[in-house]
Design a protein with these regions (language model features):
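Mg2+-dependent endonuclease catalytic cores in nucleic-acid-processing enzymes, primarily RNase H-like
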Residues: 73-173
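Residues embedded in well-ordered secondary-structure elements
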Residues: 43-44, 56, 94, 142
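A general structural motif
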Residues: 57-60, 86-87
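ATPase catalytic-site recognition across NTP-hydrolyzing enzymes
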Residues: 1-55, 69, 170-171
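Generic detector of well-ordered alpha-helical packing
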Residues: 54-57, 109
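Short, flexible loop/turn motifs enriched in small residues
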Residues: 48, 59-66
């Protein structure tokens, strides 16, 4: 009956029927198996798909600036830098833009991101800022842009290809 109601691969069936541990906790937004599956999935390697770069700038402390390069469903590169000033961070982003030639570079404009975005805009790079406090496109479903983007990423992970990267996995789950 549990399998009929919830499905053979559901956490309910894993616990109640098979006596296994659930794949995810009740409060966990992204299940570990989604990330593990994406890390095992081969790259699609669609060289005609546009490249998009995402940047989460940071300065000082334990946080790192992270630059992620995506082509279609594939994450093709993750670069991390710790402790750099704003202009050095801009330099790292320019290096990634020059190497990967993205259709767009999206930057978290909270905190340090405003200065990074302003400098890259001044230098005529095609960049767009995103503020995670913005209103979601579907405010009934999502409380803000951050929640909406996490939801979109969770859906995307079902077909994505991620590199084997323990820091990425820890950030996602």
């Amino acid at each position: 009956q549990i399998i009929d109601e919830y499905g053979e691969d559901s956490d309910e069936a894993r616990v109640e029927v098979y006596g296994d541990f659930p794949k995810s906790g009740q409060d966990q937004f992204i299940a570990p198996h989604l990330v593990d599956d994406a890390m095992r999935r081969p790259q699609h390697k669609d060289m005609t798909a546009p490249v998009v770069i995402g940047v989460d700038p940071a300065r000082g402390g334990a946080d790192s600036t992270v630059i992620v390069v995506r082509r279609a469903r594939d994450i093709v590169a993750i670069k991390r830098y710790r402790g750099d000033d704003t202009m050095t961070t801009v330099g790292h982003i320019i290096d990634a833009i020059e190497e990967y030639r993205p259709a767009l570079t999206v930057i978290d404009e909270g905190g340090l991101g405003y200065g990074v975005l302003d400098r890259l805009t001044e230098q005529k790079y095609k960049v767009r800022g995103v503020n995670f406090g913005w209103k979601a496109k579907n405010p009934v479903m999502w409380g803000n842009k951050r929640a909406e983007m996490w939801g979109a990423m969770r859906d995307w992970l079902r077909s994505a290809s991620l590199p084997q990267d323990r820091l990425l996995k820890a950030d996602l789950i």
